Amino acid sequence: MSWNRRSFLGALGVTCLAGAGMVPIVRPRTAAAADEFDLLRERWCSLVTGSGYDPDVEPFKSRLAALGAEAEQYLTTLAPGETSLWPDLPLDTSTWNMTLSARRLRTMAVAYLVPGTGHTGNSAMAEAAVTAFDELTTRFYAPPHWWGNWWDWLIGTPQALNDFCALLYEQLGPELIDRYVQRVDHYVDPGAIDRTTGANRGWLCEVTAVRGVLGKSPEMMAKARDGLSPIMVYVTDGDGFYRDGSFIQHEYYAYTGSYGISLLQSVSGLFALLAGSTWEIVDPNRQVLFDSIENSFAPFVYNGLLMDAVAGRVISREAEHDHWRGHLLAASVLRMAEAGSPEEAKRWRGIVKGWLLRESEPRYMGDQTLTMAAVADAQAVLDDPTIEPLPEPVEHRIFAAMDQAVHRRPTWAFSISMRSVRTAFYETINGENLKGWHTGVGMTYWWGADFGNDHYTDGFWPTADPYRLPGTTVSRKPLEDGVGNNVLPTEAWAGGTTDGEFAAVGQSIQALESTLRGRKSWFCLDDAVVCLGAGITCADGYAVDTTVDQRNLGENGVHDFRLNGIPSPTSGTWSLTVPNARWAHLEGFGGYVFPGGARVSAIRETRTGSWYDINVGGPRDELRRRYVTVYLDHGVDPVDASYVYLVMPGATRQETIRRAADRRWLRVLANTADRQAISVPSLGFVGANFFAPGTVDALTVDQPCSVLVRVADGRATICVSDPRQDGSTVRVTWNRPVASVVSSDPTVRVVEAGERLVLDVTVEETAGMTQRAVVALA
């Protein structure tokens, strides 16, 4: 449903509690009796329950029945006592149990109101829920109680209870509603919104707005609306959205795929709630939020999943996997489409439709955690023939503010997760993400158009070897669970440069709780990512590995794997080291090439673990997964070790062998601690990461920087960035004749263009983003 001021004012003469065609209990009122707050409350109910769908057809019929069964379970097990409403959720040991109790009440309210649950209009359900609500807000969510996690008191519990009160507003009556509003005012004090940023601020604005609706408070409505304004600006440090598309939460963490989604959920709900009302969101900076959908969120979605690289500690939660997060984002984008321009709305719906149609298991429409509203919105898009599903883009994006990069090709996607003095190694709080120590030292992820889409979903994090994460160079020194929270590296060089299709990405690595140092680069090309490492030095007294890949084959995977042509058995535990291997291939995933040959090791094994091992709130059930791991052993305490390898997602065995045999495809121009560079003549590509001033082939620079050159059709595009984000001007000399400068960014000054090209590139205040010039070749 599209919300606007005309439809809002017209609705003042009509009332239904949870959307057209949805409510079994109709309460007619005169137009005079329905004030603006009544309509806002009814609109919020519609946003909670969904509208415009037929409860007698799938996928709604079975979902409504499941909702009813869940509510019935809560009804039959409800047993208010001294310390709980439900025996399995003691309220004196965990404030999270208070939030979960509130959510159960909300489920009961929804089951009572919507058709097809088997409890529609069931007075016993409503009466039990109201009685339990009375208990909760008298003895538990009430002053002077205050302990545990602040989030449950200010956000989690009132979010669910707001929905509950809106849904059962008339059953609760003025006295209980008024008392509840006072509870919210006590915990969400007048300064609460202004003390928060990012997702927390969005959540609190939502809590305040719905509380304002329930209490009919214009002041609270204005406070909630105005509280959104600081979210709708670009930041240059700390929490929020950055111009390059980054989203940071908790000061130092890439959190687009967790807190970022939560922010979009809250804000999209408020746009829908307030549209056309006295408190409509009209801040001109709201375009920042609209732009974030394609600038911040969509680049991290592939075939409907939202990449783990930007999910922080959430990767340790069993239920909140990459597909589930993608579902939440899709639902929020569809809701936000109601607020965007017609062009944006059409494009966003097309993006989401593409995600829905391409997604592998677990699919959106089978996700039982989604609300009826989210399912109804998605079904409407799927059923609309005028909405064209948009394909995955072919592009490269560097998110310099949060040290992330994403490379997209027609049949695969690849992500690189880095850290620097700007971003902490990993976050572990509340007993979560206990072994995430090395997720930021160059971890790589990749997925194919039709393979590997459940690789990280299927028990990867509790069963994978945390010392051999793909792409990382790591000391085997044992680390304690949870060590190093909020610790930042001292190295500044992380990032790279891109022409929008290919890229040179690099990182000066510093490992957590280790003496390990080194340089890593990834050159992202058409059918491969070329990976270089150099200057790898460590004095921990432990072996150091570079992990080429650690592939999860599932519980019983028997994929064919060959190292330099030597097959591995498909069962049991197997390991092999080949002194001069040139290639490896894993059926169903892709190939790996080692130019010039390398000492390569591989393991096939069954690994076990539980979610509890990495998250104290996770189940203890043991999981078993089969893995193939390919790695380079640099030995104990290496000095200036190096490597070169290619990852070829989706490549067949024959394609891998051909690339390994082609000695002319790749030229490694430099691979030292000061500079890493390659040339691929067939692509007209040169990429160079300078960790110090110097010369590589025809390129000379006077400051640390990243440079990419693409030559095609008589022109060259020169791209430059400052991954350290602390420089002022970089002089780049390309020792090749040029005829003229076709175009350049305002930051690029042409010093010389003739027998050679000399550019002075102002990188100060460019935040690590790429600066470009295009020249015609002589």
From Swiss-Prot:
Q: How is its activity regulated?
A: Is salt-dependent and is active over a wide range of NaCl concentrations. Activity is slightly promoted by Ni(2+), and inhibited by most of the tested metal ions, including Li(+), K(+), Ba(2+), Mg(2+), Zn(2+), Ca(2+), Mn(2+) and Al(3+).
Q: How is it used?
A: Due to its high optimal temperature and stability under a broad pH range and high temperature, TcHly8B could serve as a promising tool for the industrial production of hyaluronate oligosaccharides and promote the further exploitation of hyaluronate lyases with novel properties.
| Signal peptide start and end residues | 1-33
Alphabetized, the UniProt keywords read:
Lyase, Signal
Tagged with keyword Signal: yes
Thermal dependence of function as given in the entry: Optimum temperature is 70 degrees Celsius. Is very stable at temperatures from 0 to 60 degrees Celsius.
Q: Which Gene3D superfamilies match?
A: 2.70.98.10, Chondroitin AC/alginate lyase, Polysaccharide lyase family 8-like, C-terminal
Role, per record: Degrades hyaluronic acid into unsaturated disaccharides as the end products. Exhibits very low activity against various types of chondroitin sulfate variants.
**How is this protein named in the record?**
Hyaluronate lyase
